[in-house]
Amino acid sequence: MTGTMLAVLDDVESGAGFIRTIAARAERLDARLIIYLLTPGPLAAPELAPFGALYLPDQVLQADSEEQLAKLRSALAGSPVPIDIRGLFDDVAWLAGDMRRARPIADLAVIGSHETWAIPYLYRRVTEMLALASGGPLVILPPGRSLAIVKHAVLAWKPSAEAVRALHDLVGLLEPGARVDIVSCGDQPTHDDGPRGHKAIADYLEYHDFEVGSVWLEQRYDVAEQLQTHALEIGADLLAAGAFAHSRLRELIFGGVTAGLIGETRLPVLLSR
């Protein structure tokens, strides 16, 4: 059950389509929607963040934040679901931490992909924070995609607590009787009922009356790209994966599936931890 949804953005104009999509999802679920609009201080150039910050008195930045909040409230006026719009303003380097300290409680957090953000650095930091510290599942939503109905999903499977969490969170988003393809990259084990196999996951999903498929892909270097390409080729509505099964530092230095999915999101992606 999704009773409360959380959405975060940093620009009303860039995120307009994202907000309309999330409001429609909240209406369909009869869910409450909490929206955080982040207003960073001025930068010499967005791509320089977190460097290149320019000084602006707090009262001026607050006025800018209030102006943007007024635009967002106007855009969502008349919505049939309760919407709680909140604002945070600060230096771009601190906003993700401010968001974490605010600790909004929601059943599902949703964030637009990098195309819907004015500052790429802020998108990455907020997305990582939500995946690691929100205490619930996170969906990254690229432009032109919807969360209204999930009838076909891909579950990226690698034996881990994070992947099991993704399995449980995914079930809560699926339509009754939906199809789930369990997808792993690497050599298929000889026995499917072993710890690396798909049988236990398939049994769980079938018990919940979902249609289940099992796929093993030959692993290539960029697993995040490989998973998304496969999901798009089979027409999946959503890709679900465990988030940061390795440490965030290791992912930042060496790369990883979570970092890849955050960096380039081609279909709705559910991240769970």
What is each of the regions a protein language model found here?
Residues I19-T21, G97-S146, L232-R273:
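Gly/Ser-rich helix-loop-strand patches that form or flank binding pockets
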Residues L54-E67:
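A short acidic, glycine-rich active-site loop
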Residues G15, S65, V92, I119-P120, ...:
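A conditional alpha-helix N-cap/helix-loop micro-motif detector
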Residues Y36-L38, R86-D90, L141, V183-C185, ...:
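Conserved beta-strand termini and adjacent loop/short-helix elements that scaffold enzyme active sites
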Residues I22, L72, M99, I201, ...:
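Aromatic/hydrophobic pocket-lining residues that form π-stacking "cages" and hydrophobic walls in ligand
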Residues L43, A93-L95, A118, A148, ...:
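Generic structural signal for helix capping and beta-alpha/helix-loop junctions
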